[in-house]
Amino acid sequence: MKFLPYIFLLCCGLWSTISFADEDYIEYRGISSNNRVTLDPLRLSNKELRWLASKKNLVIAVHKSQTATLLHTDSQQRVRGINADYLNLLKRALNIKLTLREYADHQKAMDALAEGEVDIVLSHLVTSPPLNNDIAATKPLIITFPALVTTLHDSMRPLTSPKPVNIARVANYPPDEVIHQSFPKATIISFTNLYQALASVSAGHNDYFIGSNIITSSMISRYFTHSLNVVKYYNSPRQYNFFLTRKESVILNEVLNRFVDALTNEVRYEVSQNWLDTGNLAFLNKPLELTEHEKQWIKQHPNLKVLENPYSPPYSMTDENGSVRGVMGDILNIITLQTGLNFSPITVSHNIHAGTQLSPGGWDIIPGAIYSEDRENNVLFAEAFITTPYVFVMQKAPDSEQTLKKGMKVAIPYYYELHSQLKEMYPEVEWIQVDNASAAFHKVKEGELDALVATQLNSRYMIDHYYPNELYHFLIPGVPNASLSFAFPRGEPELKDIINKALNAIPPSEVLRLTEKWIKMPNVTIDTWDLYSEQFYIVTTLSVLLVGSSLLWGFYLLRSVRRRKVIQGDLENQISFRKALSDSLPNPTYVVNWQGNVISHNSAFEHYFTADYYKNAMLPLENSDSPFKDVFSNAHEVTAETKENRTIYTQVFEIDNGIEKRCINHWHTLCNLPASDNAVYICGWQDITETRDLINALEVEKNKAIKATVAKSQFLATMSHEIRTPISSIMGFLELLSGSGLSKEQRVEAISLAYATGQSLLGLIGEILDVDKIESGNYQLQPQWVDIPTLVQNTCHSFGAIAASKSIALSCSSTFPEHYLVKIDPQAFKQVLSNLLSNALKFTTEGAVKITTSLGHIDDNHAVIKMTIMDSGSGLSQEEQQQLFKRYSQTSAGRQQTGSGLGLMICKELIKNMQGDLSLESHPGIGTTFTITIPVEISQQVATVEAKAEQPITLPEKLSILIADDHPTNRLLLKRQLNLLGYDVDEATDGVQALHKVSMQHYDLLITDVNMPNMDGFELTRKLREQNSSLPIWGLTANAQANEREKGLSCGMNLCLFKPLTLDVLKTHLSQLHQVAHIAPQYRHLDIEALKNNTANDLQLMQEILMTFQHETHKDLPAAFQALEAGDNRTFHQCIHRIHGAANILNLQKLINISHQLEITPVSDDSKPEILQLLNSVKEHIAELDQEIAVFCQKND
């Protein structure tokens, strides 16, 4: 049973909670206030009293945006805070029940007021009452001011700054323009939470915070007591807290205003002080009671000049901007909030009281002035608001006594009123007047003074901050306390009355709090420069004068030393320069005195001789071992003219440098020495040994060139004769053949002789080309396994007719082992043998020519071929043998025969390339023997040489051949040769015409001259290969050099043949094309099967369709290009559509795809490059189709 009451209470609580959950508000259970402040009874009218008696309960709405300092709930759901204390006072003053409801936001509370659910809305802090015709606002219950906050350690930061700073705020209060008035370059960071904003300043992320003084001070008191500090209050924009009622609730509004009026500044201060440790400005809620005259004076004097002493902490200090700080700075800040007066500081360097001597209007107020009856005649004093005792300051020592001793030096500021009194109390002490007490602390610490008279607050601050372990203070007995107040010019009694009213409104506790705040303020630095600047300037001036005079004396002493050093340096520089200049010369130079001794030389002189022979070079020139003994044989005979004109004597001779004799061009000249009567010789030489050798070598080469020119002229004369002779014979035979008087046998003989003469002419040209190949290094040997006896026998057999015609016995014998092969180039070996055999038969008129061949073994795989060619001809003298193997040279007997004089030279070089040797033995009138020895590899396999039956040459049928040559005769000859072989031939006069014909018609072979106008054969071949043409191409050239053939093959020719082109050569190469005629043409793009199906295999109709397609596309495509360029989109699409349609009929897939892409691509400036690319693709594709159409039409004619 004992648990029933608790169960009942729990159920009631749950029911009430559920009921609150169904509403838009939470109803508080009461007001919790421990404030014992009482108000005087309100003077209410009978009507107001009757209304309150009938009302009995006032429902007041608040909302969650109220800060904890103003209103918050405890664990019992009772409200606490500054507003709660005011509501508790309202409850007691009106003797009425109050019901508090909390709404989610301000708007819902106002809606409840409008609907009559509540009687009053207690607003949050706003800058002005709401503008609503249905709502009435009372006088402000709370007034707050913007507060500037920074870190405790940086409390002396300037209160205004043009520099960039970071400033935090909450909910955009205060506005940007207000902040920028003091900090024009501020970066403003807005927070939604006050704690985060203050924490950002404490952590150093921001420099300042600006916000409401009540809320900010409450948060600092709770969480940032030791890190943040309020350094200034601003007069605007202020924030207010109102009671809001309905417009018709006139009586309620009047009652609430009477309550607000009853809240004196003292009551407000006491209520706020219960919640704030600092920043309580509640005593400013009601303005000062100023007379109209005082208000008018403030309007006329809004700005006042303040004489400020920066060296009187904690009363008065300045920051870097010169603003007044310290206790007096905070008091002036409060007076500004009370009166609107602005204070401009004027700094006094030494003694603030000296300001009283300024001219009238030079100052308006002195803060922190110590009252003195003597000075009251000059200035007005406000009522004292700080009193502090006087103290003695002395050095701290173990045996320190709190008294003054005889003979002590004691400093006292001259403006202290107890100066005369202390002199009477301590006559044995030496009293020293000072301008400033703060500056004298350091002198006491240094022992310059024994004691100092100061106020207790000033002494406490200075010792605690600067001399905690060096100084201490004690009270001066029997003297009155110092009274601090404000001083004014005697002509400003109104200002005195205004300041007195403002000071009286400040609670004494607030003055004590400000004093304690600055005494405990850390890290405040006092700039004492002005106190010591005069002494510093005096000492500095004397030091500068002393240093300057010393420097002048030093300069005077060092001037002569420097001058000597400069002269010495110039001399050393000249010597060094001359030495470097001499050593940098590539040619040797040296100096010889009048006695002939070498007194100086450069490095090239020393390096020219060997180390041992250098000693001889340094000997006097008269010494016989000196290499220059002949230089000065007449040196002393130099005339006066030589001395004046500096004539340079040169002579060329040879000297020994220790290794060899060198030829030099030596020079010398005379140099007079002005400082003495003596003279020296400056000498040198240039080595011209190489130059002399080069000139000699050039002379030799010049003679060789002259001889070569003569030999070449002789060769040209010989060659012109050798070439002219067979050409004349050919022309003579042709002339005979053109007539009709020859019989058939004579004609055959004439043709045969003309052909043989032409072959000899080709052989002559071949010899010249062989020489060029050999000398250029392009002749390549191609060794093969060869049966040497058989090769020699066949070669001899070919010369049998010539030997028989001259009745010369030609024999060929061999001791070669049977069944042996040797590895050798058969063509080169045969050429050597043929040349030597031809010469032997040429120069032998009777007798015999013998050829013997043998093989000398070296080992199993190597041997040496030895072959001799012996004739019984005219023989050669020794002089002729010396010239025999030289180019273009012929013997006297040879010049009587035809020949180029190159044969033996070619033989010599070919044998040399085969690592062999060619020698001769000859005697005039007896004969000549040539001996050849060639090292070779041998094979012991059985050699089987079978005569291969000549394979019949099979020529291809139906070849379509194109000839390109600019020479009509060459085209006619080649065309007749091909016609003779049964082929149809087409002609082109240059490469351009040939390229066009190939593009329009199919050919199986192109034979082109390499040298043609407009486009030569090489360029024609490159163009065709760039079109991926596989057409066989033969090049024809009259230039028989190998590089010409290589050039043709490199540009893509299949063959490069040399003119003249014989029928046998043509047959041989044409036989390799025998498969061409049997290969069916391949079509990459034409669909022949589709064409056959659409035309019932009618070849004529197929050709007509293809020719029509070719004709129409060649009209439409250029028209499309022109339309695109002109911007005629309609014509452009018509042309493309026709091409697309024709491609569909012939089933040309690639052309279908490209034309379709062109049709669907919109024509614009952006797409124009893409369309041009597609049109070029169509153009290239149609060119390929033209070739295939030409092939089809040609094959089906």
Curated annotation (Swiss-Prot):
Record note on modification: Activation requires a sequential transfer of a phosphate group from a His in the primary transmitter domain, to an Asp in the receiver domain and to a His in the secondary transmitter domain.
Membrane-side (Periplasmic) residue stretches: 347-537
Per the entry, what this protein does is:
Member of the two-component regulatory system EvgS/EvgA. Phosphorylates EvgA via a four-step phosphorelay in response to environmental signals.
Q: Which UniProt keywords apply?
A: ATP-binding, Cell inner membrane, Cell membrane, Kinase, Membrane, Nucleotide-binding, Phosphoprotein, Signal, Transferase, Transmembrane, Transmembrane helix, Two-component regulatory system
Q: Which domain of life is it from?
A: Bacteria
Q: Which residues lie on this side of the membrane: Cytoplasmic?
A: 22-325, 559-1197
What is the name of this protein?
Answer: Sensor protein EvgS
**Which reactions does this protein catalyse?**
ATP + protein L-histidine = ADP + protein N-phospho-L-histidine
Gene name, Swiss-Prot/TrEMBL: evgS
What SMART domains would the database entry show? HATPase_c, HisKA, HPT, PBPb, REC
